[in-house]
């Protein structure tokens, strides 16, 4: 299947499931099970409950998806006076 056939949607992570799977609610209210893409696993990108993500869906099975991007929101500015750990 070519990449042009994939549907790209936005959603919010509702629940973290075993084996790097997540229950995600799409913007249209549809709920599905999604897994992280290989590059996200390779780069150790963490996904938490409440994160906004971009998903790829197959037009043949809309109940499963692949998370390809985690949108970063401002979670507060880091404290510049905080001491860093030295290893």
UniProtKB/Swiss-Prot annotation:
Keyword terms, alphabetized: Cytoplasm, Initiation factor, Protein biosynthesis, RNA-binding, rRNA-binding
UniProt GO molecular function: ribosome binding; rRNA binding; translation initiation factor activity
Gene3D superfamilies: Nucleic acid-binding proteins (2.40.50.140)
PANTHER family: TRANSLATION INITIATION FACTOR IF-1, CHLOROPLASTIC
GO annotations of cellular component type: cytosol
Gene: infA2
PROSITE patterns for this protein: S1_IF1_TYPE (PS50832)
Domain S1-like: 1-72
Functional note: One of the essential components for the initiation of protein synthesis. Stabilizes the binding of IF-2 and IF-3 on the 30S subunit to which N-formylmethionyl-tRNA(fMet) subsequently binds. Helps modulate mRNA selection, yielding the 30S pre-initiation complex (PIC). Upon addition of the 50S ribosomal subunit IF-1, IF-2 and IF-3 are released leaving the mature 70S translation initiation complex.
Name of the protein described by the UniProt record: Translation initiation factor IF-1 2
Native source species: Dechloromonas aromatica (strain RCB)
CDD domains listed in its UniProt record: S1_IF1
Quaternary structure and partners: Component of the 30S ribosomal translation pre-initiation complex which assembles on the 30S ribosome in the order IF-2 and IF-3, IF-1 and N-formylmethionyl-tRNA(fMet); mRNA recruitment can occur at any time during PIC assembly.
Similarity-based family: Belongs to the IF-1 family.
Subcellular location: Cytoplasm
């Amino acid at each position: 299947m070519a990449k042009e056939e994939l549907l790209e949607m936005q959603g919010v992570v509702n629940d973290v499931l075993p084996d790097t799977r997540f229950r995600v609610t799409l913007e249209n209210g549809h709920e599905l099970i999604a897994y992280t893409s290989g590059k996200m696993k390779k780069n150790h990108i963490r996904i938490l409950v409440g994160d906004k993500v971009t998903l790829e869906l197959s037009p043949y099975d809309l109940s499963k998806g692949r998370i390809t991007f985690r949108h970063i929101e401002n979670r507060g500015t880091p404290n510049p006076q905080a001491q860093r750990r030295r290893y």
